[in-house]
A protein has these predicted regions:
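Alpha-solenoid helical repeat scaffolds
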Residues: 29, 110, 143-147
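Hydrophobic/aromatic side-chain positions at a characteristic register within alpha-helices
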Residues: 4, 9-19, 33, 97, ...
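Residue-level signature for tetratricopeptide repeat
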Residues: 14-15, 31, 48, 95, ...
Length: 156
């Protein structure tokens, strides 16, 4: 039974890293029935409880830029939330959330990359670069920040 739980938890983490927070949450809720005493799963449940309403409300925000900004600002709140939890933070779970949240932000910013206004494009390139930096893709981040500075010197 424990091996099955661990396998499903790995699947949940992989889906989470791709940014499908709702599907990952569904898998975790199924696991919770059999793993109430598992501290990693409890920590993940607490993390999902922070994000789930935010993710569900994203479709009500019309502008992709505002969606991206919401995700980035909530990430900062999330880190404060994690510090206050009774569970010891699990770095792997935090990494999976970081990948998922910043991937979602990237998806939203990329919808605006072809903005005709140079200033807007510079800002979008900067935001995309910052997301890639958080995801550990430093070369891509650097390229985006260089593009941002090319479009509007001093932005990035």
């Amino acid at each position: 039974m424990q091996a099955q739980i661990e396998e499903r938890f790995k699947e949940c983490c992989q889906i989470l890293k791709k940014g499908d927070i709702l599907q990952a949450n569904d898998i975790l809720n199924q696991l919770l029935i059999d793993a109430l005493d598992n501290e990693r799963i409890q920590f993940a449940v607490n993390c999902f409880s922070f994000w789930i309403n935010i993710i569900r409300q994203l479709p009500t925000i019309e502008e992709p830029y505002a969606k991206g900004e919401t995700l980035l600002s909530e990430w900062i709140s999330f880190l404060s939330y994690v510090e206050k939890q009774k569970y010891t933070p699990d770095e792997h779970i935090l990494y999976c959330f970081k990948c998922g949240i910043f991937s979602l932000a990237l998806d939203n910013y990329y919808q605006l990359i072809n903005a005709t206004d140079f200033e807007q494009r510079a800002e979008i390139s900067r935001k995309i670069g910052l997301c890639y930096k958080k995801l550990g893709e430093y070369e891509t981040a650097r390229d985006c920040l260089i593009e941002s500075n090319r479009l509007k010197p001093g932005v990035a």
